[in-house]
């Protein structure tokens, strides 16, 4: 259960706001937000990808407003697979991810609560956030939540359809092997999701 440290499951983001510090008109630049598998919680890994004239791609670290290079970024649920979607109507990014509430639990106690792997692997709480810039995230609410850790809702994907946000995710119930190896796919609808912006 203890995979090596690393990054995986990238989300590709293009910053279109010309006032965003990471936006540039000079080159085609994309940002990769990746799940950070570190044993910790609420961080993601960040790469910048610059597409050259010959279509080759050059990866590099991004910089903070102070000029320091940045590799990891505070990110709600960045320790498990997450999904970012951009809403052109409001110009907000939306994030669907798992919420950690108990990551400081002793590993020896995990079998008592049916948690899979490490203490940070809480998969039974699926949360929604919004942001103007993919850095400052505002909590919008819970998409799905259970007190039973076997009932996972994880590995989300989302699409905007009209006024609603549709989310599908790998899910589990009492018939699943564990919260990681799921036996269902569930569909969740956040109706009028733009009204959650405050």
Region spans (language model):
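Beta-rich carbohydrate-recognition and catalytic domains
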Residues: 1-9, 13-76, 87-92, 98-149, ...
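Conserved beta-strand position repeated once per blade in WD40 beta-propeller domains
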Residues: 9-11, 81-83, 155-157
